[in-house]
Amino acid sequence: MQSFGRRSFLAGAAALGLARSARAASSMGTARGPVQASWPSLVDNYRYPDWFRDAKLGLWSHWGPQSVPQQGDWYGRFMYMQGHPMYEHHLKTYGHPSVAGMKDIQHLWTADKWDPDALIARYQKAGAKYFMALACHHDNLDCYDSRYHAWNSLRVGPKKDVVGIWEKAARKAGLKFGVSNHAAHAWHWYQPAYGYDPTGPKKGERYDAFRLRKADGVGQWWEGLDPQELYTGGHAVLPDGIDSIEAMNQWHDANNGQWIETGPKEDPAYVTRWLLRQTDLVEKYRPDLVYMDDHELPFGPVGLEAAADYYNRSIQWHGKIDVVLTGKQLKPYARFGMVQDVERGFTDHLWDEPWQTDTCIGDWFYNVARLNDKSYKSAEEVIQRLADVVSKNGNLLLSIPQPGDGSIDSEEEKILDGMTGWMAHGGEAIFGSRPWRIYGEGPTELIAGMQNEEKAKPFTAQDIRFTTNKGALYALFLGRPAGSTTIRSLARGRIEGQISQVTLLGGGPLAFRQDGAGLHVDMPRNNSFVPAIRIDGRGLV
């Protein structure tokens, strides 16, 4: 099915003349090679790397200056929106955003308890086969030695090449290394920083992004840096005269709160700088995986330039395209030219092509409330998710949030320990595996799509997922069965082949019988979470 889809798209593209618009290299100095900046060329040249299909689990350090306040996601936007809890926290903790802005939060990012080697070792024990570092989020600070963006982590905050240090630690441990780029959205995401309080004693007083220019930094910690480069310029600025929080929120939602993939019309240089920053990132750190926080690719043809550059560089590095580029909400044809990522979501069917879901045990950026109220995903929930995703031909990219100092908290350590314990016996059903004929069975229905985790119902002992590995069939129980358990998909007459042995991973052989109703297995009581069995026999796989 995959080959047919690829051929069909390429034939249609040729008929429409789409391929002829491609260029071998751009005027931006992107890498030359066979891959051109067009969808037909991406599709024609791309093949999913075996290492990615084998890896199954990646760990992600979604870590940057927005972790400093320990309030969760999108602090750099919501701190500028009066009435939001993050605005109130900022006002009490750091001061009014007309004086203390996001640039000052970035200055407070210390990373003084960050031990990358120890964290990588812990993540690897928990099953990670690849590791991803956040390179730049919507707050527009490059967390690496950026050639084209002065607001970077060597000049601001920890004064370290965060991505470079992560990269060395990951590769030393033998992990594949990835980076995530979220910067394409900074130009509209940051616009509340140009606003003001619509009510209260500071009513109408513009925030720091509106007021400050490079010359204002003389004698300040940010001397020599231009705040407009960080805050991206006023592209959708709150107009004067709004006098209620409700009206302010409505204006922001309508004018700069949309998730769009175009650049600012009046500032094409912003898009040019984005491409320079992206190609610089890829050239410096040679990532095995690049995560784009975008629907397909950002900025239309410029995103295609970035993709072609990355693939051509991979050919220079490896002699072939041996890297992964992910995007979201891909059209069917695009899934043959890059890898689909489903953020905080599920799929309800077995995919023909590899894909990835990314999620976090808590908020993307560290939120201390998750520690205090113990609301992280448990190790059991993580492994349930992993089994479901892998059975459907996917990978799981899991974020373990860190506070600004770079540590992880005690509850996160427990979750990683739980994952480590499960991997010791269950890993053979996951790593290097491939899907079976069907992904599984059970009563729990999952709603497909991104950003829908909260709609998911708890799994039961009847929810079972299948994988295959080295000629064996595996069944993973998402709940905790006890006593005689029936796998209906393995009923005599429904499958060909003969079952000779059933073994509990981490245990021993189990009694079983097979009839027209299913495979009946005597499971021990007091199982650990997500017990997995290996099913051996002839003609099963």
Feature roles, as predicted:
Residues 1-16:
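N-terminal secretory signal peptides and thylakoid transit peptides that target proteins
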